[in-house]
Every structure is written in C-alpha cells, then in structure tokens.
Regions:
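A conserved beta-strand->alpha-helix junction
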Residues: 41-68, 158
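The feature marks non-catalytic terminal segments
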Residues: 154-205
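A short alpha-helix-loop-beta-strand transition element characteristic
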Residues: 147-155
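Short, small-residue-biased leader/transition segments that mark boundaries at the very start
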Residues: 2-7
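Generic beta-strand/beta-sheet core signal
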Residues: 22-24, 57-60, 101-102, 130, ...
Length: 205
C-alpha cells in the first residue's frame, strides 16, 4: 500500500463508499514492518473513510509457484491476475459491488493499458481506478495533503516488487497469458484455497 492506494481510498470514501481492503503479504520476503506500514496507512485513511476491514493474504506460496512455472517476463501480470481473483473473492463474499485499484496509466510495466486490460479480464465485478490519470507529482501533492506521504515512502518490501523480471512484458497477449496460466494446473487452485482460508482480518478504526 502506497500513496496511490491512500489517495484511491480517500477519493472513493468522500463519495460515501465503505471500504474493505486487501493486502498481499509474502513472508519472509516481506517483513512484519511492511505489514505494519499497511496497517498504519489504513488507520490514516480511516480518518476519512470510517472503519476499514483489512484482509491480509499470505501470497508467498502462490508467488513462488508462479515464479517456478511461468515465463519470468510474465510474472507481474500473472501474479496481479491472481491478486485480482482473490480480491474479487472477498468482494463477493462481503457483497461489495466493485473493486478499486490504485493504478495510474503507464507508471510501471503492469500499468499500461494492455496490462490493465489483462488484469481486468479475470474479474466479473467492475474495476474502478480513481487515480488513473494522475501523474507522480499530483499523487505526491495529494498524499501530502491527506497526511499519508511520509508513511507511504517508508522503504519496506512490497510483494509486487520482490519477483520482478528485468524486462517485464508491457503489452501482454491475452492468449499467451492464458496459456501460461494453464501450466499452473490444479496446484494453483489448492494454493489459492489455502491463502483464502488463512487470511487474517484486521478491523481498522
């Protein structure tokens, strides 16, 4: 969770939308300090949004399995597709009406229009992106305004960056991505089930 996520949540909250959040934790690659940073940011956002239910998903085994089975230039896209599947599971379970993400177009390889379309494909709920047109300067300015900037820049690990390829695909071909996911077989379903069943829920006031 960084500046984009805090801005995303505060923008949606000011329209009266209740927020449930999902954080993907990958111990031992991401530390307890990284998790605490997310909790601290959620508390800051809760000042604007009201109570937040934070789902902490242990994503390590899923990430490692994808890393072992899939082409490395596709890792980020495939991991994010599984993150979206998990987020949608909790959204439907809690009767939410959509998913909200913090991407802005083109800032990183996973946020090109082609990449966003690839992650959207696995969801049946609508995906909203409140900061999609913001540049980095706008994001920093707003995060300072809502008092989340200093916490968001704490240099702790992020599960989206620990298995990044040197040259990640920026224009994923959906047929190729689907074919790579087929290699994951039933094992990925078992890992997903375990991750869902062991998710920690933290009520943020």
């Amino acid at each position: 969770m960084g500046s984009e996520m805090c801005i995303r949540d505060s923008m949606i909250a000011k329209r009266g939308v209740k927020i449930d959040a999902v954080y993907f934790h990958a111990p031992p690659y991401t530390s307890e300090r990284a998790k605490q940073k997310v909790v601290d940011l959620a508390r800051l956002v809760a000042k604007y949004s009201g109570p937040i239910r934070l789902h902490v998903v242990n994503f390590t085994d899923i990430q490692l399995y994808i890393y072992d089975q899939c082409p490395h230039d596709e890792l980020t896209i495939i991991m994010r597709r599984y993150m979206m599947r998990i987020a949608e599971h909790f959204a439907k379970k809690d009767r939410c009406l959509g998913l909200i993400t913090g991407e802005s177009i083109g800032q990183v390889a996973s946020q090109t229009l082609q990449s966003l379309a690839s992650t959207n494909e696995v969801c049946t709920l609508p995906v909203y992106r409140p900061v999609i047109g913001f540049d980095k300067e706008e994001i920093v300015r707003i995060s300072r305004k809502i008092d989340t900037f200093e916490t968001s820049i704490q240099p702790f690990e992020d599960c989206c960056t620990i298995f990044v390829a040197k040259h990640p695909v920026t224009k994923p071909n959906l047929k190729v991505i689907r074919r790579s996911e087929q290699k994951l077989s039933e094992k990925i379903d078992e890992l997903m089930e375990t991750a869902l069943n062991t998710t920690e829920i933290i009520e943020i006031q």
